[in-house]
């Protein structure tokens, strides 16, 4: 059987003394609540275990990282959403075979070095899925299955779209940062392109301000708080998305958009890894629609 890119990296690590290999396991528990006109419409609770591995070349600045999804459990209300989520979990395991090139200036993901492997795994999964649903007779059901496959394929085969999806996942926002390359930021504000969780494909400028809460020789506890410009709150693209997707059921017209991101991180600065973290994201069309995400991660053995 052909070895994967990451298996080959493992073998090279064993043969070279200028390469540093590290790994941690994390447990991530996340709750997403969507409310329409103040009434809960959908709640998704996800429990996941991940293996986070990274390799650094000690002679020249270069790093690869790999975050494998070990197991995942999802509960959803209303239950009618459960079946589509089960297929999405299968696809998550494929996506999480990605190996990332790390930007040595920021600690952020710069690209997927084994993207071709992910596409190959997707093609195999798609073939099996089409075989499993070949019995379908209903034209509407067939159309829904094909639409689902097309929407997934659009993301997986496009490295930039897949990267954007990873940046929308809380665990990636928390694990991939300056500390990973020995350049943590506890003072200066940073500007990011925040990926909306409420409106797919929408990004807008967000300013993050750090503040140290507690520190020792080896560890730091710090928080990040966000601010969004008034321009982003009234963006035409968000208004258009709201009018098309939500206004028909909510009826109330678009008011204004707001988003908040807050996180608390316990960082082992000496060994350069997150020990535990908690973050909140809230997005809303004021008075009409809201999405709240609460995510906690912690290192496990």
Predicted features, each with a name:
Residues 2-301:
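Signature of exported/secreted
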């Amino acid at each position: 059987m052909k070895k994967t890119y990451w298996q080959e990296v493992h073998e090279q690590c064993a043969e070279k003394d200028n390469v540093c290999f590290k790994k941690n396991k994390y447990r991530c528990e996340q709750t997403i609540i969507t409310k329409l006109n103040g009434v809960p419409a959908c709640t998704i609770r996800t429990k996941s275990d991940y293996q986070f591995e990274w390799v650094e070349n000690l002679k020249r600045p270069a790093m690869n990282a790999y975050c494998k999804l070990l197991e995942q459990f999802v509960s959803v209300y209303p239950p009618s959403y459960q079946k589509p989520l089960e297929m999405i979990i299968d696809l998550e395991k494929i996506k999480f075979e990605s190996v990332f090139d790390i930007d040595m200036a920021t600690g952020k993901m710069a690209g997927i070095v084994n993207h071709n492997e992910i596409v190959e795994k997707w093609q195999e999964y798609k073939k099996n899925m089409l075989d499993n649903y070949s019995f379908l007779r209903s034209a509407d059901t067939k159309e829904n299955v094909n639409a689902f496959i097309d929407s997934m394929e659009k993301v997986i085969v496009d490295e930039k779209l897949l990267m954007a999806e990873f940046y929308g996942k809380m665990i990636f926002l928390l694990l991939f940062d300056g500390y990973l390359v020995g350049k943590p930021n506890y003072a200066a504000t940073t500007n990011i392109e925040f990926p909306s969780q409420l409106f797919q494909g929408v990004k807008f400028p967000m300013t993050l301000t750090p503040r140290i809460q507690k520190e020792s020789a080896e560890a730091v506890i710090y928080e990040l708080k966000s601010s969004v410009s008034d321009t982003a709150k009234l963006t035409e693209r968000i208004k258009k998305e709201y009018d098309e997707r939500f206004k028909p059921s909510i009826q109330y017209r678009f008011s204004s958009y707001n988003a908040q991101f807050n996180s608390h991180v316990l960082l082992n600065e000496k060994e350069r890894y997150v020990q535990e973290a908690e973050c909140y994201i809230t997005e809303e069309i004021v008075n009409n629609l809201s999405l709240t995400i609460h995510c906690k991660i912690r290192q496990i053995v």
